[in-house]
Curated annotation (Swiss-Prot):
Species classification: Bacteria, Pseudomonadati, Chlamydiota, Chlamydiia, Chlamydiales
Function: Involved in DNA repair and RecF pathway recombination.
Protein name as annotated: DNA repair protein RecO
Alphabetical list of SUPFAM superfamilies matching this protein: ArfGap/RecO-like zinc finger (SSF57863), Nucleic acid-binding proteins (SSF50249)
Protein encoded by which gene: recO
InterPro entries attached to this UniProt entry: ARFGAP/RecO, NA-bd_OB-fold, RecO
Keyword terms of this UniProt record: DNA damage, DNA recombination, DNA repair
């Protein structure tokens, strides 16, 4: 059976001879596929297999064999990202976040749309690392792992006017904070909430025009979430909710 789907190549790994195995993120989720002679100059869709490339793929499915890329029509090579180290580094951060949180074959149309739009908009930003950290926050929200209440998870003390401590998906007051929690001032937590609640990309792009020193804390918060999860990129979705 053949299917046609849009997708962004996240990784491209060499196989024997000049074959490659690509990991593609699409509305259908994270997929791995084999491309015969994909690294060869004679492959007419070789460029569609490069990492950070958006293409329309024709894929052959013959279980239990690995999917096979039959054709790829390059739609957007994201040349601007690939020609700038800061942009490339920031895009790579988003890619790693997807690889570390998403299960194979779990449909994620909303997350794919979010990721694709972040890739399109990141060249417009003055602070791409901050912009990619915004994606990590949106991803935490998508996974249902970002507490937006205003009270301590343990004692329910109001955090309206005090330093807020976050770890994984929980909020803590100063009394229940531990050495691994990440502290956010009221102003920093307000910015975090503005990012999460933003409904338009232009709002995020505008926010990323300011040198707001919060990206390191967001990245640390995301890492705390990963510390309690398995390695989803090595597992397969079996048609049931796993997260």
């Amino acid at each position: 059976m053949q299917i046609t789907l849009p997708g962004v190549v996240l990784t491209n790994s060499p196989a024997e001879k000049q074959h490659v195995i690509v990991k593609i993120f699409s509305p259908a989720g994270l997929l791995s596929a084999f491309a015969k002679n994909g690294a060869s100059l004679s492959c007419d869709f070789r460029e569609s297999l490069f990492p950070i490339s958006f293409s329309l793929f024709t894929i052959q499915q013959s279980p239990p064999k690995m999917r096979k890329v039959i054709q790829g029509e390059l739609q957007n090579p994201f040349t601007t990202i690939k020609s700038s180290y800061p942009l490339l580094q920031s895009a790579g951060k988003m890619i790693q976040a997807i690889l570390k949180t998403q299960w194979h074959e779990k449909p994620s149309p909303h997350l794919f749309s979010l990721f694709f739009n972040f890739l399109q908009r990141i060249p417009e930003t003055q602070y791409p690392n901050f912009f990619s950290s915004m994606f990590l926050l949106k991803l935490l929200q998508h996974e249902g792992s970002l507490d937006l209440s205003r009270s301590c998870t343990l004692c329910k003390t109001s955090l309206e006017s005090s330093t807020i401590y976050r770890y994984e998906g929980a909020l803590f007051c100063e009394k229940h904070a531990h050495e691994e929690t990440i502290s956010f001032s009221q102003e920093e937590d307000h910015i975090l909430r503005v990012i999460v609640q933003a409904k338009k990309f232009q709002e995020l792009v505008c926010l990323a025009e300011f040198p707001i020193d919060i990206d390191t804390k967001i990245d640390a918060l995301f890492s705390s979430f990963l510390s309690e999860t398995s390695e989803p990129s090595s597992l397969y979705y079996k048609g049931k909710t796993l997260l």
